Amino acid sequence: NLDLKKRIEISNYAISNKNSTETFNISSNVDNGYSTGGFIEGSVTPYSKQLYKSIGFKDIQVKTLTLDSVMESLKITRIPYLVKIDVEGAENIILDGALKFINKYKPILLIELHSPQNFIKTYQLFSKLNYQINQLHSDNENRTFIYLSPITKLEQNKLIKDMQLFLQIQKYG
């Protein structure tokens, strides 16, 4: 699609939780059923690093930047409305480096989570950020697909009123 080509920029770095150099585990064999190609060190993966090495994964060093630092360096002309995150177990690594961006722009997020611990951490984080969390799909490989949207002030006020009404009913029976 030539129209999309004008709006896409390919950059030679990985998004992470720090501006640094990190180990990236990569495989050229994406058809073996173990991965879609690679993951950054610290990702929550279904198998041990030793297993990945035994099937041909190699360690390479990659430049990493936070999404916050990337967004600060870009000249944003359109506010991001939707962000999709599918990063093979590095969801919370990415999110840790994107908090300023998320707080400033309040985008809708579609995230594929790769473990129960990532689901819990993501739920805790976005509950504090006043996001509504909806599970779209879950499969038998510990992957959960979620949709997160910011709760508006109007929705917050309605939730508070509903909770106050609930507490009154409980108190007075």
What would you call each of these model-derived segments?
Residues 1-173:
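Phosphate/nucleotide-binding beta-alpha loop and adjacent structural elements of enzyme active sites
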